[in-house]
Design a protein with these regions (language model features):
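Alpha-helical transmembrane segments and their membrane-interface boundaries
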Residues: 1-59, 66, 115, 119-120, ...
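Small-residue-rich segments of transmembrane alpha-helices in multi-pass membrane proteins
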Residues: 37-47, 71, 98-111
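Hydrophobic, membrane-facing alpha-helical anchors
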Residues: 12-16, 66-82
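C-terminal halves and exits of single transmembrane alpha-helices
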Residues: 77-87, 106-113, 117-119
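Alpha-helical transmembrane segments and their membrane-interface exit regions
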Residues: 124-134
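Hydrophobic alpha-helical membrane segments
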Residues: 74-78, 95-100
Length: 140
């Protein structure tokens, strides 16, 4: 394992924690730990898929790394479903579930060495959570 991989894992965890911190201070169902771990795991799965490509190429076999990313998205869907609840007529947790999916994508971006995309997406996610939440309360 080289230092770049360690840096990727740390960056993914840090970016996930920024998003998780926002959810934590708003007392949502998933917070700092959950979002940090989602981003970290997504980065790890992406890194592993790239390593598997190299391993399979050496053996003369094909490998499709998008299958691992696809499986992650399905898994995040199950995790996200666990934070969605109905309270009377209101459904709560949809934003947190969607944010879990976005955080997973941030981890994938870091694992794929798309650092600018990962950082930009993290801050755009935070902007949407803060800015759009304010707009919803003010106008809807």
């Amino acid at each position: 394992m080289n230092l770049e991989i360690i840096g990727q894992i740390i960056l993914a965890t840090f970016l996930g924690s920024l998003i998780g911190f926002e959810r934590e201070i708003k007392k949502k169902g998933a917070g700092l730990q959950t979002f940090s771990l989602i981003s970290l795991a997504s980065c790890l799965f992406t890194l592993i898929s790239f390593e598997l490509i190299n391993l399979f190429i050496e053996k003369g076999q094909g490998f499709d790394p998008t299958r691992i990313i696809q499986a992650m998205a399905i898994g995040i869907g199950f995790v996200g479903a666990g934070v969605i609840f109905r309270q009377g007529e209101e459904v709560v947790g949809l934003t947190t579930a969607a944010t879990l999916l976005a955080t997973s994508a941030v981890g994938v971006a870091v694992g794929a060495k798309l650092y600018l995309l990962a950082v930009f997406s993290t801050f755009l996610t935070l902007f949407v959570l803060a800015g759009f939440g304010w707009l919803e309360k003010k106008f809807f």
